[in-house]
């Protein structure tokens, strides 16, 4: 429903809630097959279903992901405030943490971030009259039209409520799973853990950041990130691995079931559309 607010603001007619849900869950299911395949599929699905420009739909999808990126940034800041000691422990204890700390503080990274868009802009200007650059510019403008609806769409308040609601549910998945294992229950009752909210936040943020690494639904990077996070609270590697594997496996099963439902829904919708066109 959140994405639907953007789509309508971009001039795309209201989509049935079931169809919109199918596009989301189908995307998650396809991401289990190949990284980011689901994102491409859901844009193509909506563009074909509503007979609209694909680049406009892609722009709304980028806006949707930008909203999630803002939420992750806010969660990182919150984690640095309430769990700074555990983050410092990760950066000091593990080679990965030391490498990450060096990577983010190295001036080369920031020089690249500054120079990359300048180089792209210069190259685009030099070759501005070529058909390739003109086509790219046209597609980028359509994507910007889809993305920019975030700043002037109706229902902004509801969009924000949906965004916070989605991420609260994501967090609760991680937090409630603590109750399922004896070795994580003490994180809920332990002193200084705020009823498990601090460990839950650290594990959740580590897992969320790992999703930026291309993978099949997070398999691998997400598990490693969760194991690292749990180890900061004294959970052994074997127990932490069990937590991450069981958690990920149940999520994958739910997504696969949702994907199967989505496939049947699309198949039946197309059949009904063909029958309707034949009658006409």
Where are these regions (language model features)?
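Re-entrant/interfacial helical elements at transmembrane boundaries that shape
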Residues: 37-48, 215-232
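Short amphipathic alpha-helical coupling elements at transmembrane boundaries
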Residues: 8, 12, 44-48, 55, ...
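Extended non-transmembrane interhelical loops and adjacent amphipathic helices
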Residues: 3-11, 21-51
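Predominantly cytoplasmic-facing regulatory/coupling regions of multi-pass membrane proteins
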Residues: 1-25, 82-208, 250-280
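Alpha-helical transmembrane segments and their lipid-water interface positions
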Residues: 3, 31-42, 68-79, 215, ...
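Transmembrane alpha-helix interface/packing and boundary motifs in multi-pass membrane proteins
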Residues: 26-35, 202-223
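Membrane-interface alpha-helices at helix entry/exit sites of multi-pass transporters
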Residues: 17-19, 37-39, 52-65, 69, ...
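Hydrophobic transmembrane alpha-helical segments of multi-pass transport and channel proteins
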Residues: 69-70, 209-218, 236, 248-257
